[in-house]
Amino acid sequence: MSKESVAIIGATGNIRNYPKSEGRLVDLGRGLVTHSFLVIPECPDPLLGRDLLQKLRATISFTGEGPPEIRTEGKLLVTAPLEEEYRLFLEAPIQNVTLLEQWKREIPKVWAEINPPGLASTQAPIHVQLLSTALPVRVRQYPITLEAKRSLRETIRKFRAAGILRPVHSPWNTPLLPVRKSGTSEYRMVQDLREVNKRVETIHPTVPNPYTLLSLLPPDRIWYSVLDLKDAFFCIPLAPESQLIFAFEWADAEEGESGQLTWTRLPQGFKNSPTLFDEALNRDLQGFRLDHPSVSLLQYVDDLLIAADTQAACLSATRDLLMTLAELGYRVSGKKAQLCQEEVTYLGFKIHKGSRSLSNSRTQAILQIPVPKTKRQVREFLGTIGYCRLWIPGFAELAQPLYAATRGGNDPLVWGEKEEEAFQSLKLALTQPPALALPSLDKPFQLFVEETSGAAKGVLTQALGPWKRPVAYLSKRLDPVAAGWPRCLRAIAAAALLTREASKLTFGQDIEITSSHNLESLLRSPPDKWLTNARITQYQVLLLDPPRVRFKQTAALNPATLLPETDDTLPIHHCLDTLDSLTSTRPDLTDQPLAQAEATLFTDGSSYIRDGKRYAGAAVVTLDSVIWAEPLPIGTSAQKAELIALTKALEWSKDKSVNIYTDSRYAFATLHVHGMIYRERGLLTAGGKAIKNAPEILALLTAVWLPKRVAVMHCKGHQKDDAPTSTGNRRADEVAREVAIRPLSTQATISDAPDMPDTETPQYSNVEEALGHRLRGTKDPAGWWHLPDGRLLLPRAVGRKVLEQTHRATHLGESKLTELVRKHYLICGIYRAARDITTRCVACAQVNPGAAPVEKGLNSRIRGAAPGEHWEVDFTEMITAKGGYKYLLVLVDTFSGWVEAYPAKRETSQVVIKHLIHDIIPRFGLPVQIGSDNGPAFVAKVTQQLCEALNVSWKLHCAYRPQSSGQVERMNRTLKETIAKLRIETGGDWVSLLPQALLRARCTPGREGLSPFEILYGLKPPVVPRVGCDKLASITNQTLLKSLQALQATRSLARATLRDQLPQKEAQQDRTPLFQPGDLVFVKKHDFQQLGPRWDGPYTVVLSTPTAVKVAGKTPWIHYSRLKKAPDNQEEWTVSPTSDPLRVKLTRRAKP
């Protein structure tokens, strides 16, 4: 009965209230309805009320004779618009509530709301496989609020009553972590099994991919039912020996219980639970799939979806599935069941009449995500919205700024306009997502591909009449190598990427790829200058698969829809012609000799080592003359020299028609093949790194345009025949090798005196004239002073011009410039003029590392007034040692110079704080001030907050000025140098050698003659060898001498007394070892089995001492007490001949 009642006035005129029944299913003959009946026990016969007659659409008529007649059939005239006429033939959908109530009566055992948790009747208990190195882990229970504990108490009592939990005593323990259910005061019981998961073997996950699962749903099946299994994991039993590892603490004061509980079923939070349950349920439902081939059943762990063609088929299949689940022991949530509907929500997607779209709840959840503050929040946002990427055209291009913002390790998040625009654009795209069609595997697919800014974009469609219906929007970022290709080749990479993605939805069905590029021609005639053989093969295997894959070229794709433009007048470009124009550095460049060349040049670069130095030179020659030849800086590679020589040849050939020969494959390929590729990539290699010799390559690509016509040919080097090509190449090689050892041309530019004005006489001052006479110089007829050492005395004005010209050619510093010019000229005031010229040079000011001089007294560092008052701290990078240690945290007390250093795996603020709190402050007291550079570990918020809490001043030094931290920087160098020396002597790693390096640094005297050890402890450093008794006579201080002698006598007496009290040991120097190398011995086993041997072996003795031996096959030394001699002749060797007279066969056999 329901709580509702109705007031009734009967024939007597009295008013009485009668109750109404709950809604019951009533079959009216034309369909099912829900009706609440009025319950009147006094009524002798059932009566049809007006409400039920209205649902029957009954007509009551009265005739003259007989009782009234009730007719429920008749003709009804319906007038409707033609476009709405189809509605007359639709079946009225059955309400979800109606079916749920009916099936709760028919199949009561399957519903979770009215039954205890289920148990799969056909599944064997699960055995959990631990790692071979796993040991029990014990993690104490987190504090739980009283409200959460009350909520968990009811859940645990229910599970204990159902046998899902049981008391246990286990060495394992992990905590519970209650999680509040959204919108309620209840808590979900979650166990923190992270430590257990680390110690359990991971099985291969076989859970279906939700990205492709709905692709298995035929679009013509438009009636759906969705079932969600309740407490699904608890249906699978757990083996008793595996139950102990999932124990947790629980105390129930009301029941008077306290101890550990564990699961007897598969627990939630265990990393293998989804896979184990998915496989178990899939096996149990195999029979249902075979019995119902006309419906589709999709399973994602515990979420089930049935799809059928008609409502009747969906009803029948859903009923059978519920009965099957009830028989197997599973439970279905009635609250979440969606029964026989045309629109359902499954895995966050809304499915309706063969299409899928994003559910409103998922969209609203993403739209409410605030602007990220950390890189982790950016990754969380990308992961959440990435689940919806099929509905966002060009997702990869839109999200690229956000992906870029997550790089950089632990660096702070940089959030600018680009990141904000990308964040809002992705959210905006979610507010208007399209409805995507479910893929039909009976129809071919069309893939429209476009590439922009290194991102592949496309849309996968299927034909629906004359329209193209989208199935998915696809997008991926190209790898760095493909992103540097020309646009036509990037289209191939985009097509390959998206075809691979589309195959997850097409399942190998026919696909037509449409692009604005002629992809098929490019694939059949691949440009091997750009693509490696491996990539060509990969693309051809994936895309050249007729008739499954077909290509179609269109003029352009609409950037908004990624579908072809309808305008057929747009031109279609030719990809091969475009690639040829991009590959060639200039259109008329050829590798065949020109017939009417004005000159034929031969280039070569030479690089070789002599006296430990690498000399290099380059030359450009003809058959009878040298065009250009110069030495190159020490250390120049041969490839770089070849590029320079070829560039000089092209520069000399300006406005000429020339043939140029080179024997360098590198220079030839750079000019003909790779030069434009490097330029397109932004001077990057295939791996995304900067190319070598980038300035020389750019100069070569610029110089190739200077000749009027040019042909560059490759010839073999070091040929001995008399062909003109070989002769010219040999000549270029000889000249290049010859000039390599010459001084650089910088000195040649000033080796001769500059051109002096012929019409002007040098104007010497009186001082300069007197200087010329004093140095016994002579004047030539032109008036120039020549000194006896061969130098020329220059007036100040002329001398300044010489200095300026020399500096422009060399950009030498003040001292080197003066030294160089003084070899040829004598100039009064040369040092002042050189200083003025070098100071005024803009190029030198921009490049030279020297900074402006600091006024004396301003660059002094702060030092403490007592030990431990002021510390300088810094991280220095080391080579990676055992344990992953890569950094060294160094702290120096500025007062005493005492150093502390700690190895670290990461350069983080946690490391700094740990050693400050645990090491520095407990040992040296609270510092007044700490100084450091602006490293992330020191400017971190947590570091600064700690200093504020401790009232310690943290001084950040000037950026890019290591002198501000000079004391700790110098200590870094000292420690590294000491460790390097110790590594050379011992071969150990730097972590193990660090204590010895610290000892050396702490005991080294400073400028005042005192070491940090002396300043801190007031004692001499314990590193100087002790002075023995034989040295005491050399000491002149008689008082000190007597004291030392008395101390030595007391020491000797004490040692003698103690020596007499010790037990006498047998002399072992003459004792012969019991076992000799080569002997066979048995080794006693530590743990032998009953009825098994106690001794292992025999083993051969390798080394022996009077007390222990080392045997072959065992690492440790073994004491004599665990050895015994093995009998001799334990094995026998025999020699037998073979078919080869030079070989014999040796056979070893153990004697019985």
Swiss-Prot record:
- Enumerate the catalysed reactions: DNA(n) + a 2'-deoxyribonucleoside 5'-triphosphate = DNA(n+1) + diphosphate; Endonucleolytic cleavage to 5'-phosphomonoester
Where does the chain bind Mg(2+) 3? 874, 933
- Asked if the record carries the keyword Transferase, the reply is yes
Query: Family, per the entry?
Result: Belongs to the retroviral Pol polyprotein family.
Could you state a single Gene Ontology molecular function term?
A: metal ion binding
Top-level division of the source organism's lineage: Viruses
What does the UniProt keyword field contain? DNA integration, DNA recombination, DNA-binding, DNA-directed DNA polymerase, Endonuclease, Hydrolase, Magnesium, Metal-binding, Multifunctional enzyme, Nuclease, Nucleotidyltransferase, RNA-binding, RNA-directed DNA polymerase, Transferase, Viral genome integration, Virus entry into host cell
Tell me the protein's name: Gag-Pol polyprotein
Site feature Cleavage, where: 78-79, 751-752
Query: CDD domains annotated for this entry?
Result: RNase_HI_RT_Bel (cd09273), RT_ZFREV_like (cd03715)
Describe how the cofactor binds: The RT polymerase active site binds 2 magnesium ions.
Q: Which PANTHER family match?
A: LRRGT00076-LIKE, POL PROTEIN
**Span of domain Reverse transcriptase:** 158-351
- Name the coenzymes or cofactors required: Mg(2+); Mn(2+)
Q: Which species?
A: Avian reticuloendotheliosis virus
Provide the residue positions that the database annotates as binding Mg(2+) 1.
Answer: 228, 302-303
